[in-house]
Amino acid sequence: MITANSFERTIGGRKLVIESGKLARLADAAITIRYADTELLVTLCSAKKPREGVDFLPLTIDYEERMYAAGKIPGGFIRREGRPSEQAILAGRLTDRPLRPLLPKEWRNDLQIIITVIASDKENDADIWGVVGASTVLAMSEIPYEGPVGASRIGYINGEFVLNPTFAQLESSQLDLVVVSTRKAVVMIEAGSKEIPEDIMINAIEFAHKANQELIDLQDEIRAKLGKEKLPVPVLEIPEEVKTAVAAFVKGRVNEALSHQDKTARENAVEGLQAELVAALSETFAEGDILAAYDKEIKKAIRSTILEKDIRVNGRGIKQLRQLDAETGLLPRVHGSALFTRGDTQVMAITTLGSLQESQQLDGLSAEDTKRFMLHYNFAPFSTGEVKRSGSPGRREIGHGALAERALVPILPTPEEFPYTIRLVADVVGSSGSTSMGSVCSSSLSLMDAGVPVKKAVAGISIGLITGENGTYCTITDIEGIEDNYGDMDFKVAGTRDGITAIQVDMKVKGISFDIIRDAIYQAKEARYNILDVMDKALAQPKTELSPYAPRMYKINIDPSKIGSVIGSGGKTIRSIIEQTNTTVDIENDGTVVIGAIDEASAKKAIKIIEDLTKDIEAGSIYTGKVTRIMTFGAFVEILPGKEGMVHISELADHRVEKVEDIVKVGDDITVKVIEIDNQGRVNLSHRVILNPNAVPISRNRDSQPRRPGPFRPSDRSNS
């Protein structure tokens, strides 16, 4: 038996075990991390040589879900795992975002961390343990790394913070917060919440940071025992003579180029100055060094202007929003639409409503199997005026869509209140920073325009950070793309007037203090209110009527014991209803039936069929049915879908009838009255009493009547 190094802690009342040396022994570093009965294999491999021609850290983090982990066989024709699920992509991003700032920017060797979920107890989310596992293998490896980090999930239930809540606990929690931090500072925050007040959110982040310390202690213990000696950090210095020459050439001109309020004009000015610079110095110095030095001059100009003068590149104040505009009812025929504009950033959001049958089917390790609300974010290359490949969404698009979706979930009506599947598409048509928060604003308005009875409007804002020497810093409201590129933080906050619904924080520095967190959260609140004022002018309340092109949903309730009558054998009956009426029919186990139709007449037709299928036949009731069979002694009539009774030959007319065929034929419609239901459930009908209301029906001894093929009991043929 292979022996492994094992390390244990009790975290949140459950056992955490990290083992190394048993699996993936040829990887540069590998561990298994197990929390309760959820287990992951985390590996790290590094290329031996730097990759040529790259000017960034080539880090790849893949998060892979094995369906066997939850005892499931993958769906699809080939029955094996294919492209990662949306949840797996988001979990990979959750790991990448906090670790990247802690690795040397100068590192050029390919790094690949693969996180594989190999066991899932369906109670504990594996995503945060992917972060802890990835941090552990980096700490053990020879890669320079300024970690380790801890990662904790925090819930807020009945006024108490809960460390690493289970899936079941999260359903009743007002908060789903993930915080990743080092020993001293927070490096990543991600949250979805039900309008949590700012002070509670800050306290929750502090609670998580304290909980992370035990995970950092554990990794330090592992590193002390198993860690390799770290490699030196590569040095990529720009020669001093290049920096001096570039600074002298652009002196005073960089600030002038950056001062244009219009993004296109600013970019043209910056690129024009760059072209002059390269033309003047390229015979003396390497072009790569010139461009790197010029980039540093731009960064220095942007940051120093903010720190020293409280003025930004385009002349805005540090808390000043860009020009805002909101518009609804943008497109014809669609169910709901809105356009939100913030400076040069524009997002068009379109709402489409469908039946609950159109919910997304999830095939992953998630506890959920369907999803009725979807927000899909698209970022076209024309939004930045560039020529790029246009194709399926990447990790960034999926992440931005998930953030906007999370921000809107708390204000949506329940399926009981609004039995629709809701799909939002946020198309970025212009980008100069903060498109994800623009997507929140436009999507909130689009839902209202579609008539979705949302509880409140939601707005989003991004707060940036510029740090200086000796701990000085400045938080800036509504960052543009250039401020995001050269700044230290992107602190996104979405919410209503009553609280926060989502947070996502990414940074380029190695962590932020709680003073910065506090400033950013309250600065975002002030900006959010201003944005909501503009949105309210466009549309303050959801429309009271749905679009005429949206499907209509009608809800009825039936006896749960009659569900089988509606579904039928192998779904035959319900398929027939859908085909006959051109509707959709969803049935819940409690007997709730939701009918979706493009018009009221189709819905009423479907409702009538369902009510007839579940209705009990009562003596004395009158029905118009169809003759299904002719016997010598009478005719069988279907009076409700799948339910028959018999009209004896003597009850077909108010005179003597020699042959049944003289009065009716198969397929004829006939109005009859139920005159008797015997103790075996067989139904006797009369047409004679319809013709002559004063006629007295003849009571018969049904035991003397022949057995089927002619019994008169009500039947649900679809169940036979």
From Swiss-Prot:
E.C. no: 2.7.7.8
Oxidoreductase among keywords: no
CDD domains, per database record: KH-I_PNPase, RNase_PH_PNPase_1, RNase_PH_PNPase_2, S1_PNPase
Domain named S1 motif: residues: 620-688
GO cellular component, as recorded: cytosol
The entry's keywords: Cytoplasm, Magnesium, Metal-binding, Nucleotidyltransferase, RNA-binding, Transferase
Nucleotidyltransferase among keywords: yes
Cofactor: Mg(2+)
GO molecular function terms noted in the UniProt entry: 3'-5'-RNA exonuclease activity; magnesium ion binding; polyribonucleotide nucleotidyltransferase activity; RNA binding
First-tier enzyme category under EC: transferase
GO biological process, one term: mRNA catabolic process
Location(s) in or outside the cell: Cytoplasm
Principal location listed in the UniProt entry: cytoplasm
UniProt-listed Pfam families: KH_1, PNPase, RNase_PH, RNase_PH_C, S1
Record domain KH: where: 551-610
Residues covered by region (Disordered): 697-720
Catalytic activity: RNA(n+1) + phosphate = RNA(n) + a ribonucleoside 5'-diphosphate
Family in the record: Belongs to the polyribonucleotide nucleotidyltransferase family.
NCBIfam families recorded: polynuc_phos (TIGR03591), PRK11824.1 (NF008805)
Job of this protein: Involved in mRNA degradation. Catalyzes the phosphorolysis of single-stranded polyribonucleotides processively in the 3'- to 5'-direction.
Protein name: Polyribonucleotide nucleotidyltransferase
